[in-house]
């Protein structure tokens, strides 16, 4: 038995000697035998399974992301699902993963463990955006789902996020219930690694197609796009999952001039072309902005590695490229949805939108002026998903977002979605052109109409390598 509550040095030795651990793990650990500090870092605690799942540095050890810590998480989740849905004939889950190092390995091991516990698995054939995984849970009628991703963390990291049957990240009471089950896994011997291939079904293009068809229904004003289909858009997935769907989605919406950054359209968990794959940072958009200047583009968009967040840039009145922050994007996003819904006579009085408490209050002013219910919730997209779930079948969700660059216009996904967001932001730019404006001028007009707020500042991108 490998009990993971002893002194760190003892646990280190257990991992070296115990037959349950594989040779590669032991080799990695032997290599640090003289580095007391590194041994301590890796073994002084268990990598904690929290309300958002796991996140940590990849490597051998109890405080690292590896097949054993991921295995314990999946075994604990399996035990919880089997207890929670014990009357169900066949429990099923979706397993997705991003571009990170070991993501596909951890996903395949998790699929084996779920199936070893009698749970049917829909495993994506290749990396896919997180929002598509959320969609697949709902579409396939699953009870849960996981995605292996660490969002925009540095390359050394990976992570594991658990979702519930509504396609949203787990909330109370299930989050605590799962944590308790994961904490009960005392040793590697408790993890069922021997998969049952009969219970694993590979999914891919079949789900892509249905998801993209659904995303197309998010478009509010296709005519505006048709009038500006030649608008030049530069997009980068920053080596991540957005490359699988976002250029395709933009073309499906009718945008004919989508330029991608070739060096960043290569799947790579080391993110070699950026310091950090975070679309909030100007530095991550450097290559996209260089391409935009070269071709005189109208709009630049970048999604993070798991394609749930999007950063955008456009030109100001002096022709300089500026970054639009998450608050400003959310403001334009919801301004467009609400005013267009009104203008096109789509409002029934039953609509609502949601923002997190830290997101700009100007959205509330827009909602009030247009007589639409606007809800505030805690920070984190699972709380927006909760508001949607509470009103399921009663009210119509038309959009929401948060200042940390996450937006969602549709209710068939229950997590932030950069696929639909990129398409809708491009549509907003086309609509602005209809009115003889740039995206930047539209933003300024919103400030003039609703009042300038503290996030009014727009960052001009400084030329040069570091952004």
Kindly give the residue locations of the regions a language model identified.
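Glycine-rich phosphate-binding loop plus the immediately following alpha-helix
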Residues: 163-192, 327-351, 355-365, 418, ...
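Gly/Ser/Thr-enriched, mixed-charge loops and adjacent short helices
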Residues: 38-43, 47, 158-286, 291-292
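Short Gly/Thr/Asp-enriched flexible loops that form oxyanion-binding sites at enzyme active sites
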Residues: 106-114, 157-164, 308-328, 363-366
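N-terminal small/polar loop signature for handling phosphorylated ligands or for N-terminal nucleophile
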Residues: 94-157, 256-311
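Conserved phosphate/anionic-ligand binding catalytic regions in large, soluble enzymes, centered on
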Residues: 43-63, 150-153, 233, 237-249, ...
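Phosphate-binding and adjacent anionic-ligand microenvironments
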Residues: 293, 297-299, 320, 340-467
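An N-terminal, well-structured beta->alpha segment
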Residues: 7, 12-110, 201-229, 241
């Amino acid at each position: 038995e490998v009990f993971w509550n002893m002194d760190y040095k003892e646990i280190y030795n257990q991992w070296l000697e115990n037959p349950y651990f594989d040779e590669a793990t032991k080799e990695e650990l032997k290599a640090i035998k003289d580095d007391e500090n590194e041994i301590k870092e890796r073994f002084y605690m268990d990598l904690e399974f929290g309300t958002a799942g796991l996140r940590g540095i990849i490597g051998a050890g109890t405080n690292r992301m590896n097949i054993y810590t991921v295995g314990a998480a999946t075994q604990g989740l399996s035990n919880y699902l089997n207890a929670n849905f014990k009357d169900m004939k066949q429990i099923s889950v979706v397993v997705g993963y991003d571009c990170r190092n070991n993501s596909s390995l951890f996903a395949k091991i998790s699929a084996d463990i779920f199936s070893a516990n009698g749970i049917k698995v829909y495993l994506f054939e290749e990396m896919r955006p997180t929002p598509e995984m959320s969609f697949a849970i709902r579409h396939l009628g699953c009870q849960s789902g996981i995605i292996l991703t660490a969002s925009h963390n540095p390359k050394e990291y990976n992570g594991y996020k658990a979702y519930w049957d509504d396609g949203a990240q787990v909330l109370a009471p299930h989050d605590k219930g799962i944590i308790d089950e994961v904490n009960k896994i005392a040793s590697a011997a408790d993890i069922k690694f021997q998969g049952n291939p009969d219970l694993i079904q590979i999914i891919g293009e079949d789900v892509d197609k249905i998801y993209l068809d659904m995303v197309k229904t998010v478009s509010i004003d296709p005519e505006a796009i048709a009038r500006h289909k030649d608008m030049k858009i530069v997009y980068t997935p920053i080596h991540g999952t957005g490359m699988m769907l976002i250029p395709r989605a933009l073309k499906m919406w009718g945008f004919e001039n989508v330029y991608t950054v070739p060096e960043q359209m290569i799947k790579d968990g080391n993110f070699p072309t950026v310091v950090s794959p975070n679309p909030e940072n100007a530095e991550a958009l450097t290559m996209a902005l260089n391409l935009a200047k070269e071709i005189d583009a109208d709009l630049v968009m970048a999604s993070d590695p798991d394609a749930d967040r999007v950063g955008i840039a456009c030109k100001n009145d002096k022709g300089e490229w500026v970054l639009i922050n998450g608050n400003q994007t959310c403001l334009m996003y919801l301004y467009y949805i609400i005013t267009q819904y009104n203008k096109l006579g789509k409002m029934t009085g039953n609509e609502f939108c949601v923002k997190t408490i830290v997101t700009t209050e100007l959205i509330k002013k827009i909602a009030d002026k247009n007589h639409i219910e606007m809800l505030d919730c805690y920070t984190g997209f699972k709380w927006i998903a909760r508001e949607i779930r509470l009103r399921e079948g009663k009210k119509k969700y038309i959009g929401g977002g948060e200042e940390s660059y996450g937006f969602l216009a549709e209710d068939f996904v229950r997590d932030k979605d950069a696929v639909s967001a990129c398409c809708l932001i491009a549509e907003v730019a086309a609509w602005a052109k209809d009115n003889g404006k740039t995206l930047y001028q539209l933003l300024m007009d919103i400030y003039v109409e609703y009042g300038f707020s503290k996030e009014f500042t727009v960052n001009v991108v400084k030329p040069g390598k570091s952004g």
